[in-house]
Amino acid sequence: MNNHNGTLHRGWQSLQRWRIQIFVITWLAYAAFYFTRKAFSVAKLGIAEDPSFELDKSAMADLDALYLAAYAVGQFMWGVFADRFGTRVVVLGGLLTSALAALVMGTFATLPIFAACMVVQGLAQSTGWSGLCKNIGAFFATYERGRVLGLWSTCYAFGGLVATPFAGWCAYRLTHDWRMAFLSSAGVVLAVAVLFFFLQRSRPQDVGLPPVEAEAAPPANAPRPNHSGALLKALRNPHVLVLGIAYFLLKPARYAILLWGPVIIYERMPEIGKVASAIVPSAFEVAGLAGPILIGLASDKLFGARRMPACVLSLAALTVSLALFVPAMQSGSLYLVVSLLFMMGVTLYGPDSMISGAAAIDFGTSEAAGTATGFVNGCGSVGAILGGLLPGYFDTLTVFFVFTATALLASLLLVPFWNSRPGACRVEPKAHAGGPLLAAGKPR
């Protein structure tokens, strides 16, 4: 008996260590993707004034659209590959490829090279979300995923928050050359790729531990689903399908601010300068650190693992914030603009992380978590194309009117699913739920 308890204790300690390690390295990996993702949005400020590389706003918008289209294709594709080959292979390849593409963009300033590299960046960066969410799902049980993924989802808010001023400082304060936005960002991603190689594993079984949740094993002779079969299975799940549509409607606003925030601020407030124009939109991402944590706690603790109520309420508040943003900019008050950016960050990043992370994993089940998450994020990435295109072709008033309408529609779509819970959901276990180690509970 003592030997059995000792084995359980060692197993629990090992699992806890790996859970912390996986949480940290996957958090860093996705945050790192934002350095190469935000490099072009910062470089736009210098490119617009560089006579040797003439790109107008519409051309920049077209490049963003190329990137986002490739990103959308990758989201649909890499989720299936993560299920088939594991997170390690898919995400590590994405990190290395993204860094290489950024190095090329910082070295060769021609439109054909930029166009090709934006496509490569889209495909490379889209390896991250579905694979890393699957990685987290493998190490954490259903009852705790809401708050765990809520905390973990701060990675992309933090990544965007740090990446933009970092690239702006390197490009316009350290070197006065927009190319450094790409080169410095590539260096960060390469460093994280090295850490990922040494510290990441795809699932507990890869380090000799049992799965955190016991699931019925498929028959030994069951055929392995192909790519199209896995996607069709996701499409037949009404929860996953509605999540995909809602994410399609939500994503344009976020990406317009991410990709065009510095340009929008600089055009209306040129007196504050390029570095400050790159920093002001960071209020959106500072708030994004809190949004996923708050919505994750709310969904698990207040709504009993129901993901939709917290999303609906947050999206309603986002609708109001988006409607007020243009009047705030017309007032000329920088403090009011920053305050609304902060409010938009809280109310957008929360449902963004919940819809694309915990909800997609829960309703997709662990067997096809990567595929379901990839499908939902692929839908969002198609919507994000509008976020990259619209600010380059239309005035700010029109753009934010569209975003207000899409946020409202997304909230209304989720209302009928208010009481939905994932099939695997159960009350937080005290002595019986979960896999072998979780079933035993923490050794006393």
PLM features: residue spans?
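Helix-loop-helix hairpin linking two adjacent transmembrane segments in secondary transporters
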Residues: 152-204
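C-terminal ends and interior cores of transmembrane alpha-helices
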Residues: 96-109, 316-330
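Extracytoplasmic
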Residues: 21-55, 257-262, 352
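Helix-breaking motifs and short loop linkers at transmembrane-helix boundaries and internal kinks
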Residues: 52, 86, 107-112, 175, ...
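Conserved MFS/SLC helix-loop-helix module at the cytosolic interface between two early adjacent transmembrane helices
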Residues: 73-111
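Cytoplasmic membrane-interface "Motif A"-like loop-to-helix N-cap segments
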Residues: 84-95, 301-315
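Extracytoplasmic gate region of multi-pass secondary transporters
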Residues: 40-41, 237-293, 352, 387
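Cytoplasmic helix-loop-helix junction between adjacent transmembrane helices
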Residues: 117-157
